[in-house]
Amino acid sequence: DLVFYCPKCTAERQTACPKL
């Protein structure tokens, strides 16, 4: 899956953000 962890998301709820 083309998904990466954004610093902002990992800092808030540790969720994967969709790769733009």
Swiss-Prot record:
Description of what induces expression: Up-regulated by growth hormone treatment and down-regulated by fasting.
UniProt function note: Inhibits IGF-mediated growth and developmental rates. IGF-binding proteins prolong the half-life of the IGFs and have been shown to either inhibit or stimulate the growth promoting effects of the IGFs on cell culture. They alter the interaction of IGFs with their cell surface receptors.
The keyword Secreted is assigned to this record: yes
Protein name: Insulin-like growth factor-binding protein 2
Entry remark concerning the domains of this protein: The C-terminus is required for IGF-binding and growth inhibition.
Domain (IGFBP N-terminal): residue spans on this chain: 2-20
Keyword Methyltransferase: no
Listed GO CC annotations: extracellular region
Localisation per UniProt entry: Secreted
Post-translational modification: N-glycosylated.
Subunit structure: Binds IGF2 more than IGF1.
GO MF annotation terms: insulin-like growth factor binding
Keywords: Glycoprotein, Growth factor binding, Growth regulation, Secreted
Coiled coil start-end: none
